[in-house]
Curated annotation (Swiss-Prot):
Keyword Ribonucleoprotein found: no
Protein name: Nucleotide-binding protein JJD26997_1583
GO CC terms in record: cytosol
A single MF term (Gene Ontology): nucleotide binding
Keywords from the named record: Nucleotide-binding
């Protein structure tokens, strides 16, 4: 039996789930009656995790955003991890949404501080874009998982490498 157990906290997105949400959103876009006759497009830049929405109507742009976010929720991606990058108007209204897939230093410090303030018998350390949590008992690690899930973070938190 291992003397110490550990896991990593990260904000990694499942690229396949992101792509599936994109495909489902495109399919719904094609079948929605309220969007018939209005030029609307949804594109996904997989490298940067950016959804590019465009519409000839500003009101329908918010409908497109709601469609994308609802599909992301159904695929298990936290909607708080989606940031609005830019909103442009002109002949076509455009909106860029970015799916955040990294833990920035501010959120990492917040998670680390919360874990240390919990008085659980665990050690946590920031390792780049991940946080390693080590404990002697798996129950303590599970308590940390629950604690981190309850935090109101704008990230898609995932737990990896439970040993």
């Amino acid at each position: 039996m291992a003397s110490e157990h550990s896991f990593d906290i990260s904000a990694a997105l499942d690229k396949q789930e992101l792509k599936n949400a994109f495909e489902q959103a495109k399919k719904e876009l094609d079948s929605r009656y309220d969007l018939k006759g209005i030029k609307c497009e949804i594109d996904l830049s997989e490298k940067e995790n950016i959804f590019k929405l465009s519409s000839s109507s500003e009101g329908k742009l918010d409908v497109l955003k709601d469609i994308v976010i609802s599909k992301l929720i159904k695929r298990g991606i936290n909607p708080n991890a989606i940031k609005e990058l830019s909103r442009e108007s002109g002949a076509m209204f455009r909106l860029n949404l970015k799916a955040n897939d990294t833990i920035d230093s501010e959120n990492a410090k917040k998670i680390n501080k919360t874990i240390k303030d919990s008085k659980l018998k665990v050690n946590s350390s920031i390792r780049g874009e991940e946080i390693r949590v080590v404990a002697k008992q798996i129950d303590d690690l599970q308590a940390v998982m629950k604690l981190v899930k309850e935090l109101d973070l704008e990230l898609n938190i995932s737990f990896k490498n439970l040993k």
